[in-house]
Amino acid sequence: VGTGSLAGMRMLNKLEGQACRWPIENNTDDALTLVEIFPSFYFSLASVRPIKGNHARLDMLNKSLAFFGSNFLPNGFVPKGPDFDEADALVSSAAIRALSSKQEVWNMPACAIQEGWIFGVEYANNFI
């Protein structure tokens, strides 16, 4: 988390003026929008418990992808990365695509502007 935070801060500095940081800033011109994600949260929405690599099994990945309306991965697919990074990226991408079309996802409580917010949480609280 520490290393990722430091890398993220450097990237935010580099992207200053080129991207919107949601929910702190509103995207008014269809520019790049950066959102905070939490892959385990998206797996949980799909009723997959991301414990001890369970979420990286092909059947669990496909269950999660299907929940978000994405295609199945081919038989024999094995996610790469030391911490199942590819599995996390695949499901996060599917979740962002599926959730971003729902207007309620973009409407956050006032505290989110000061504290930040994980994309999809408020929607999920109403959904579950």
Question: Where are the language model's segments positioned?
Answer:
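RNase H-like (RuvC/DEDD) metal-dependent nuclease/polynucleotide-processing core
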Residues: 1-128
